Curated annotation (Swiss-Prot):
<comment type="function">
    <text>Required for chromosome condensation and partitioning.</text>
</comment>
<feature type="binding site">
    <location>
        <begin position="32"/>
        <end position="39"/>
    </location>
    <ligand>
        <name>ATP</name>
    </ligand>
</feature>
<dbReference type="InterPro" id="IPR003395">
    <property type="entry name" value="RecF/RecN/SMC_N"/>
</dbReference>
<comment type="similarity">
    <text>Belongs to the SMC family.</text>
</comment>
<dbReference type="GO" id="GO:0006260">
    <property type="term" value="P:DNA replication"/>
</dbReference>
<dbReference type="Pfam" id="PF02463">
    <property type="entry name" value="SMC_N"/>
</dbReference>
<dbReference type="InterPro" id="IPR024704">
    <property type="entry name" value="SMC"/>
</dbReference>
<dbReference type="InterPro" id="IPR011890">
    <property type="entry name" value="SMC_prok"/>
</dbReference>
<dbReference type="GO" id="GO:0030261">
    <property type="term" value="P:chromosome condensation"/>
</dbReference>
<comment type="subunit">
    <text>Homodimer.</text>
</comment>
<dbReference type="Pfam" id="PF06470">
    <property type="entry name" value="SMC_hinge"/>
</dbReference>
<keyword id="KW-0175">Coiled coil</keyword>
<dbReference type="InterPro" id="IPR036277">
    <property type="entry name" value="SMC_hinge_sf"/>
</dbReference>
<keyword id="KW-0067">ATP-binding</keyword>
<keyword id="KW-0547">Nucleotide-binding</keyword>
<dbReference type="GO" id="GO:0007059">
    <property type="term" value="P:chromosome segregation"/>
</dbReference>
<dbReference type="GO" id="GO:0005694">
    <property type="term" value="C:chromosome"/>
</dbReference>
Amino acid sequence: MHLKCLEIERFKSFGPYTRIPLLEGFTVVSGPNGSGKSNIIDALLFALGLSTSRGMRAEKLSDLIHQGAAKGEVAVTVTFALDAAAGGGELTVCRRLKVNGPNSTSSYQLNGSPCTLTDLHEELARHHIYPEGYNVVLQGDVTGIIAMPARERREIIDELAGVAEFDRKIEAARRELGEVEVRSDRIQAVVSELLEQMERLQKERAKAEEYRKLRAELGELALWEHLLSVRSLEAQIAQITSQLAAAEAVLAGFDREAEALAERCEQALDELDTANTRVKAMGENEQVALRTQMASVQAQRAQAEAALADLAQQQRQAQGRQQQLELELGELALTLTGFSRRQQDQQALVAQWTARLESDRQVLETSRNDLEQLSASSRRWVEEQSQLRRRLDQLQSEHDPLQRTLDRLGDRLVQATGEGERHREELARIEAGHAQLATEAKVAQERLAAARTRLEQTRADLEAERAQILADRTTQRRLEKERTEKARELDRLETQRQVWREAEGSRATQEVLGSGIQGVHGLISQLGRVEAQYQGALEVAAGNRLNNVVVEDDAVAAQAIELLKSRRAGRATFLPLNKLRSGRYLERLHEEGAIGYALDLIEFDRRYEAAFVQVFGDTVVFRSLELARRQLGRYRMVTMAGELLEKSGAMTGGSLDARRGGSGFALSEPPELAEMRARLGDLDRLLATLAERLERREQRAHELQSAAEAAQRELVAIENRAEQLGREHSTQQARATQLRVFLDSCQVGLEADRQEQADLAARLGPLREQIVQVREELAKLEQSDNHHRWQQSQQHLRELETEVRRWELQLRHAEADLQKSHLDEQLAQEKRQNLLSRRLDWEDQKVEFGQREEESRTRLAEFDRVIAELAAQVAELEERLVDIKRERDRLEAHGRALQQRQGQLNLQREQERLHQGQRAAALAAAQERLDELGPPAEDVPPPPEDLSLEQLQATRLRKQRRLEALEPVNMLAIEEYDRTAERQGELSEKLATLQRERSELLLRIEDCDTLKRSAFMQAFDAVNTHFQSLFAELSDGDGHLALEDPDNPFAGGLTLVAHPRGKQVRRLEAMSGGEKSLTALSFIFALQRYRPSPFYAFDEVDMFLDGANVERLAKMVRQQANSTQFLVVSLRRPMIERADRAIGVTLARAGHSQVLGVKLAADAS
């Protein structure tokens, strides 16, 4: 796209109609000063709407009319030639201005159709022509860049990067965020109120539900108690009555049994004394000694039996070893006997084979002598046979090669015929498979195109997701940095506030606060917060009582006082919470100027209310002294200015000294701290949301990466398949061609082989006849008797030689076996001698075992004899004592049983008499209680079976006490709580939704800010790169763009830093006029290179440059004109010489500008 034509009607210095054709390349407009050459540029700006009238060097619109007429019409038409990529053709823009005194109308047309300026700018933007761009550079634009503030210079980059669009989106999101926050705050306030109401109703509701439940339970328990009481009393009366009757019978039986037991006890004692006397007389001590002796002997006998058993076990083990030894000796005897027999047999066999071998050797020698005699007599016959054999071999040597050749030809013909058939079948299959391969190749190409599309789409999605991840990570890093800075600043401010608070109070109060005494809460000034506007008034109202120390109880106060005494730290006033009156009643204030009670203007914990009442009482805060004086004597008052008016009429006032380190109320948290905390909360939520979104996007990117890899593998597989199909098709084509050539050559070869086969058959016929004839003659010769005998002799000689070699081998094997047998026999004899030695040892051991056994049995017999004698003595004594002792033991046990029973009987009789009196009293009381209760109600539900009356009464008493403790009760709280909870739940859901929307909007704002920064830095880096190369080309120096605040570029401006050749590095403000122009032009060219346009127009931008710099500028324009159209207004020779063509502008006699075209030499050549 380029400017094709400019048509001007009555615009500034131009007359009724002027048409200026324009061509691509580099065009210079030149002419005398005041001739109107710059008006061509102004006309271009006017038509395209790229500047205001002031930008076109006109104070008002009427100045744009030819010769400044008050009335008239101006029209400028610009025609663009479109490129083929844009559809070709032309784009025509026309602007008309009608001025009628103070009134004027301006209209635009686009390709002959009316349009608005916005429509025109949108159409021009599609062709990279922007109102804020640098398509047209006027005389003041270069100096404007030099003079403009750094922030405005940075805003040029903002325009290029599209920052305004991001700002618009951010502003829209912030407006929406404000609306969301307003709705959220409104709902939050309602929810807070509902939560406070629910907290109150929750307690009342639980109390009411418990009260209602207890009343129902108590009613039911009362009915059960009456029923169980009646049942219990009736059962008790029946039981006591039966017990009284049974007890009378039991008491009578006890009396009778006691008399009988007394008589039996006396009789049993007499009998026991008689039995004891008899036992002592019979010798019980002697029997005990005999039994002890017998037990000792029995123990010794048991030891002897154990030793005998051990000996028997050893004998059995030794006998087992002896039996095993005898078995081994028997086996060895049999083995040795076998060795003897085997050796005899082997010796006989060796002798037999030796004799046979000698005999066969003699026969062999005889046969050899006979064969030599037979060979001497048959020599002539052998010579004839040899000649025939040689003749036969010669014929056979001629015949066999020819026959083999003939056989090979036959085989080759058969093989070639078979191969030809197979190749014809293969060629038919290949030709039939061509169509299928073509279809498969087409399908493979379609699949390949689809796979490439899927892969490109997946990669595009992956790149987009990665770009989003990169943007999110950038936002995350920026927010984390901001959070760190905010948290550090917040910590610093809070530390300052804490240090200030810790410095409050006197030495005495500081000693108490730092002592660590349990129950010390703090100073009044530390336990309350006030707003800044009320701080002075409230501190005057409290006075020195701000340093009063609030403690848990009077014991803590006493402990603190003793501490101050011991440390001589001074005095302090303590406010024990357990002794202060916590109630307060303050009348409603209606007096003019009264702000409120001091207590209502302080924020404090409700548990410290009594302490703050003690300090402030009913003090009222008034706006001014004048208004407070009207109420003097009615209230204790303090004014906002710090005057104090007592009820007694005393007034205190004057100037207030600035507080320097003294104690005072803590101010409510400053707004900047609250905003900082809120921002930190927002940052935490945004970072959490960003982390979740990053996780989701990374998971999505991972899935897309896997999908891309799968698509890549699929694409590779399809490409491989397509290539394989192509290779198969090419291979089959080559194979078909090869088969056709082979079949043709095979046919020729078959014909030649058949001819050669016929020739060989003709040559073989005579040879076969000669071979048959020679064989017949040889057969006749070999049928003679001499030949037969000679053959038999040779055969017999070979058999004898074989037999002799076989017998020699057998003889060597037999001798080896005999030697091995002798060796085995020697080993067996050695083992037998060892076993015989062990058998002699066992005989000695057996004799020893017999002797030890005899000794053990002798000792056992002696022990048995002693035991028998002792047993006889014990038996004799037992026969005499057993009967008497048995009778004594029986009598003793019987006497003890009678005495025990007598004592138990007396105790039971006394207890039963006591119980009888108790039963009679209980019967009377139960009957009286039953009469008082009366009969139970009929409709009472049955109580649990395992519930006793005592358990029920205890439960009823406990519930009754709980019920009384709950009163009074609001029973309507149950329904009110449910309604409030339902409303709170609905609002909480709405609030959660709004919070999510708020987080999304905040994140959208941060995303836009990140993208805005990224777009700006991308544009800045690109423009900076272009600026460095352009400045180096224009000035032979180096320079760069510098941001005043690189960390936050939008908070500062943009500076041009240049280093002209031979000079130190300078900023724009310190340069000369020419250096400033070159630097500004480099900046303009860098902007143009970043956002290229189809044409550029310069209006005398070289006016402040010297000849050398104009030459460099003209050279640069000449280079860029190769790809972009340039229209330059200039009076400088280097610029004109570098141009492709020139347009001359002069002032005609009629006072309007006249345009002449000049074709330069460069263009002509």
